[in-house]
């Protein structure tokens, strides 16, 4: 029976699932249908507002919010600049710090360097420099070169653009150029302190052409470093507009180019005397006061500073002094200037002191006038040395005062180095000679004369009538050590 049931061709149907199982099957079917169905349209009415997404810590501000924030910060920075006296409009378009604190740091740092609010107002772009990226590297480089801290304020006022410079690209090549021109490393910082604008020059520009021109007219190549050290402004002078016209004008009054080169080597600052403002008017003033045109070149060679003085009024006052105190006529005053142009700068007290000394020695004022015209150096010598010369003349040489009137340059010779040895040699030989024959010659010429047994009258007269300036060339340096005339370059350096 059992066996027939198990293998029957028509088995009985299975039992239906339990209720819980049926529900589970229905849920799975519904889920599958919703996944395969297209999304439903939003059934909300058009007037129903959409929900705002929930805020998050990682949400980004909109571009509009960022622009508003940036404008607010810039307004704060502009207000701070205004409080410093700086016009914010001067910095329009420049990328500035986003906070007042950073801008305040820059202002305080520049203030620590010695710059004032007025300086910042004059060059507000300095506030556009980063302290760490721009200022510190530049200042550190200048300090290593030897630029003094107390010189920084003036350097930055004159050339604040250095704060924007690159040490490698802008500054180091200029320093290397200076050293290549034989400017000593110890002099480089002084050059930069005096002429900081040099740091902005390009090597292939004005610097090279000005040096080349100076060498071309005869300035020694080895003297270029000294010229630059004492007058670095020459590197910024254009040849065609400044240097060449200056040289050509001096050539026009009779100076040779090589002589001009020697003047530039000794006193390079003369190149800074404006041709139209100083040089030409001063040359005209000398001619107007009585100097002969053929003597102008000699005057400039002796006293190049005359080209840069406030000359016309000074000449009028000095001519009046000489006329009233020494009885020197206007024409003779011109001869005085030709022989010693430094007489222009002699003070009234110095002139009167020397005149009083000579009159105290027994000379009449008319004789003093003649002596000064023949040898203006009398007014510049040290009084004590003049006194020693006069006492030796009176006590040892026992000559007449008229000989000093005829040869006043006697006072310019050293007693021990020249006068005493020669006087004793002449005395031993029993020769009688004039002061000019005794002194107005070189040592070699005098030794040759000592071979003479007699002195020809013609030779004596020739020496007596010789140019007094020849004797002045023999002046010993000791005569001028404590002179009342001081010739200092500093007075004329610009």
UniProtKB/Swiss-Prot annotation:
Residues 1-54 form a transit peptide. GO terms for cellular component: chloroplast stroma. The keyword RNA-binding does not apply. InterPro entries: MTERF (IPR003690), MTERF_sf (IPR038538). It is found in: Plastid, Chloroplast stroma. Residues 32-61, 457-494 are annotated as: Disordered. Disruption phenotype: Seedling lethality. Keywords: Chloroplast, Plastid, Transcription, Transcription regulation, Transcription termination, Transit peptide. One of its GO terms (biological process) is RNA splicing. It comes from the Eukaryota. Pfam families: mTERF. Residues 46-56 have a biased composition (Low complexity). One of its GO terms (molecular function) is double-stranded DNA binding. Residues 457-466, 473-494 have a biased composition (Acidic residues). PANTHER family: CGI-12 PROTEIN-RELATED, TRANSCRIPTION TERMINATION FACTOR MTERF4, CHLOROPLASTIC. Transcription termination factor required for processing and steady-state levels of plastid transcripts. Required for splicing of the chloroplastic group II intron. Required for the accumulation of 16S and 23S ribosomes. Belongs to the mTERF family. This is Transcription termination factor MTERF4, chloroplastic. It comes from Zea mays (Maize). The gene is MTERF4.
